[in-house]
């Protein structure tokens, strides 16, 4: 497909007439020349005035289009996939319709991406006035990040810039059968194929909000779904053509992420000791499928079991 812009912002929308204004205002405020980017709103069969509100608020000097789905998908995966397929940008950036971004995100993001030929650009993120994760964002700017040293596996949310060519050549799309943590699976898969990764943490760039309104991505995580994601990612890693050193780094970073993820879920759900043993035994069996990639020195002391 023709590349016409530097960046395509992809915004899935579902019944957001009362919440989308900050999102659109932040899009209107972007400092990057408007001729260099586009916005793709993908409406998932909203039943309110979301589309009308977009048309009312969006700066008409911005290149934008609205894709209207006839049947609701129930999650953000299908709308995001439609956005990827319709993109005319060298990079795509995912923005949820109830979140908003810093005015410099596109400008600073494309500058570091073009400078380093980045496949992914990470942005420091804030959730309800608190930074979501800190380790990947210790340094203000990282041109060439390392999956281990820069803790890239610790933030798999998809609010990043991804090179469109990388996504299309490797058929990286959101799995529409996964209705929870679909961004985690997408992020891990993209990380598997990315050769150059950059980080921007000189300011908060992405602002996520939590509220009680219906949300395309808001589903309860279950252990079964979580293990499905990790199993798929491990198998994809094993079958990839990446060199063994990268595979070892990726595998052990994923292992750490899995242990932390399970620990947080078990703590939140107050899992009893008997079930704790069963859950972590299952996780051990899962990663033992390719235990030849295990590297103890890559595991932090407090994460070792």
Please identify what each model-predicted range represents.
Residues 1-232, 239-241, 245, 260, ...:
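Nucleotide-sugar donor-binding/catalytic module of glycosyltransferases
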Residues 209-305:
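C-terminal subregions of glycosyltransferases and related glycan-biosynthesis enzymes
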């Amino acid at each position: 497909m023709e590349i016409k812009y530097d960046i395509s912002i992809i915004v899935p929308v579902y019944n957001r007439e009362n919440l989308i204004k900050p999102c659109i205002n932040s899009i209107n405020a972007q400092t990057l020349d408007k001729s260099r980017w586009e916005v793709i709103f993908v409406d998932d069969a909203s039943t309110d005035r979301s589309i009308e509100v977009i048309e009312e608020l969006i700066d008409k000097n911005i290149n934008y289009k609205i894709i209207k789905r006839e049947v609701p998908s129930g999650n953000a995966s299908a709308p995001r996939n439609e956005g990827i397929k319709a993109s005319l940008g060298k990079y795509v950036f995912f923005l949820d319709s109830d979140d908003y971004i810093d005015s410099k995100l596109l400008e600073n993001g494309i500058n570091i991406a073009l400078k380093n030929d980045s496949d992914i650009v990470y942005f420091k993120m804030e959730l309800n006035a608190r930074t979501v994760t800190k380790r990947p964002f210790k340094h203000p700017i990282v041109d060439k990040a390392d999956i281990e040293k820069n803790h890239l596996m610790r933030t798999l949310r998809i609010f990043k810039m991804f090179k469109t060519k990388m996504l299309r050549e490797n058929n990286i799309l959101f799995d529409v059968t996964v209705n929870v943590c679909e961004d985690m699976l997408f992020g891990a898969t993209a990380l598997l194929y990315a050769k150059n990764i950059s980080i921007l943490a000189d300011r908060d760039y992405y602002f996520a909000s939590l509220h009680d309104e219906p949300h395309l991505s808001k589903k309860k995580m279950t252990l079964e779904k979580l293990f499905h994601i990790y199993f798929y990612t491990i198998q994809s890693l094993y079958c990839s053509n990446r060199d063994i050193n990268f595979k070892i780094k990726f595998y052990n970073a994923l292992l750490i992420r899995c242990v932390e993820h399970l620990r947080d879920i078990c703590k939140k759900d107050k899992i009893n000791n008997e079930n704790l043993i069963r859950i972590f035994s299952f996780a051990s069996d899962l990663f033992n499928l390719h235990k030849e990639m295990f590297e103890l020195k890559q595991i932090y002391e407090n994460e070792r079991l």
